[in-house]
């Protein structure tokens, strides 16, 4: 069944949207200017988002996630971004670029080790694509990952790492 013909429960999506709006108004809006002026990255609000299920939107419940779909994902990110686009982007990057990649492409061991921590906001996911000489052109990346025994050795340089220090 294609997405265009799949029936969605719009009343449940509206409830999720309302929950995200309430979250943003209570935990983000009062602090936005202070965070911006002081260049503060509010890890505490991302942890609170985890309590609301917003850090594991697409992760199945068996791994501590919300087990929701992309329609709910869009509604949550939309409402949070209306109050603070940077927090919306952080939650979207965490869910899509890190957590969802581990869920879709990680091993069972990766699922067990990382997904619950990520889905609950106890761990914040990062993303490292950009390299100094190639920008974000993934086809020209120079970094490598080579398996040595039962471990992987990473070689290369990254910059502009989303959620990196």
Name every feature range the model reports, one short phrase each.
Residues 61, 70, 102-104, 139-142:
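Surface-exposed beta-strand edges and their flanking turn/coil or helix-capping segments
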Residues 1-92, 109-113, 117-120, 124, ...:
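Amphipathic, small/basic residue-rich leader segments at the start of a protein or domain
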Residues 52, 77, 104-108, 130, ...:
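Short alpha-helix boundary/capping motifs
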Residues 65-66, 109-165:
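Glycine-rich, Trp-frequent "lid" loop and neighboring beta-strands that shape
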Residues 34-38, 61-65, 98-104, 130-133:
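Conserved short loop/turn motifs at secondary-structure junctions
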Residues 88-109, 135-138:
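N-terminal glycine-rich flavin-associated loop
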């Amino acid at each position: 069944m294609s997405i265009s013909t799949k029936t969605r429960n719009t009343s449940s999506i509206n409830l999720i949207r309302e929950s995200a709006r309430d979250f943003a108004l209570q935990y983000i809006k009062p602090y936005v200017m202070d965070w911006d002026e002081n260049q503060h990255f509010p890890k505490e609000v991302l942890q609170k988002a985890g309590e609301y299920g917003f850090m594991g939107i697409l992760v199945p419940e068996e791994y501590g996630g919300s087990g929701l779909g992309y329609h709910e994902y869009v509604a949550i990110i939309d409402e949070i971004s209306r109050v603070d686009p940077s927090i919306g982007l952080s939650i979207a990057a965490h869910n899509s670029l890190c957590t969802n990649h581990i869920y879709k492409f990680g091993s069972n061991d990766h699922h067990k080790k990382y997904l619950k921590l990520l889905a609950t906001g106890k761990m914040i996911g990062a993303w490292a694509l950009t390299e100094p000489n190639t920008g974000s052109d993934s086809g020209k990346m120079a970094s490598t990952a080579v398996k040595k025994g039962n471990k992987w050795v990473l070689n290369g340089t990254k910059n502009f790492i989303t959620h990196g220090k």
